[in-house]
Every structure is written in C-alpha cells, then in structure tokens.
Amino acid sequence: ELIADLGMTLVITDHHQPLETLPKAAAIVDAHRADDTSPFHDLCGAGVALKLVAALDGGDTAMALEQFGELAAIATIADVVNLSGENRYLVQLGLRLLANTERVGLLALLEKSGLLGKSFTSTSVAFGIAPRINAAGRFGSPKTAVELLLCEDPDEAAELAEELERRNQARKAEEVRILEEIAEQAAENPRLLKERVLVFAGEGWHHGVIGIAASRLEEQLSLIHI
C-alpha cells in the first residue's frame, strides 16, 4: 500500500504458497497461484526471478540463462528444492557456467571456498558456496552477499569474501555451541530422547542458527525437533 501511495509500480515474485487474498501489485509472479498455468511449480525464488528477467527481455530464456544461470543454479541448490524437471536442467547448465564464470565476486568466493579451478557438483555448491552466502544473513545483513555478487573490483571482492568466511566460521561455532548445550540437556534428562517430538531451548541461541541445529539433530535421531 505504501508503494502504491508513493505512485510506484510493484511487481512481486515468489515461490511460496500465496494467501487467499493477494497483495496489491501490478503483477504477482508465483507458480503456486490458483490461476497459474505454468507446467513446473517447484522453482526457487531465483528461478522465478529468472523467468521474469526472460519475460522482460522479450521471452529470451537463453539470454537470461547465459547471463544469470550460475546465480540461479546456486540459489536452486541452496534452497534445497526438488532437483527434477526445470530445476535439474537449470542446475546442470548453471554448474557449467559457474566453471567458466567471469563474475569477480563469485571468483573471490570460489577461491575462499577452495573451489577455484575445480569441477563443480551440486554437493560442492551446497557445502562450499551456499553456506558462505547464507552466513551473510544469518550473522549480519544479506546485503554483504549481494554486494559481493555485484562487485567488479577484485580487491573489494576479496574483502567481502573474507567477511563471509568470518561469518560462516562464526555460524559453525554457534552451531557447535547449541548442539553441545542440547547434548547437556539430554544427558541431564534422558527421558527427553524418548519423546516423539523433542523440544529444546537455551539462552542466547542465535536465531539464524537454531534451524540448522534442529536439522542436525533430525539427521542424527530421525525425530522432529523444535
């Protein structure tokens, strides 16, 4: 409503299930809309944005993929969406583009990740690139990751990549701390582990990491964790 009051045109792209009442906008691009007729509904947010870019460029999907395919592939892997259909093609193409990328920011990130000059798989992206990009938002502002991906100065890119590395290391340390405290709680009250749903809480647990910690526990114990 504020954007409308300011006389601006709003276009929304999303990949989540929309509410029954949609926001006021000139266009809402979301494959999960009730009136959507697109054949593939499992794109991540960047995949939807890529579709919009292609549409704004006269429907030239090949050009959009050539320009932004590696970014969309990284996002697709990082968001852990279903790697079938269009997503599978997007990741296959994007990994090839990533191996030859000229994006200064990405090159700095690849070097910091120890992946520069190596062949890429969805696994190397998921465990090497994605955590460092995600760390920007988990420990600080996602703006740092955006600045890195848009950066054209090698020195500045190296500094931004180093900052993401520091945040990722901080994320790892916080994850270990949370898991250790959970282990202590479980040791003090063994009956907790016999519940079908496990609920843990702690002072000062970072909101950007508790979801990761819950996922780790789910992998270890095959139980739902809150």
What residues fall within each predicted segment?
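Alpha-helical scaffold elements adjacent to nucleotide-binding pockets in ATP/GTP-utilizing enzyme cores
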Residues: L2-D5, V48-L52, L90-L93
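N-terminal small/polar loop signature for handling phosphorylated ligands or for N-terminal nucleophile
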Residues: E1-K24, I28-A31, R177-E181, G204, ...
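Structural motif
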Residues: M8-V11, A26-I28, F40, G47, ...
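Histidine (H) residue identity feature
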Residues: H15-H16, H32, H41, H206-H207, ...
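Short, low-complexity, polar/charged sequence segments that are solvent-exposed and flexible
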Residues: G7, A31-H32, G47-L50, L149, ...
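Short alpha-helices
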Residues: K24-I77
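Glycine-rich loops and low-complexity Gly/Arg-rich segments
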Residues: L10-T13, D35-T37, L52-A55, T101, ...
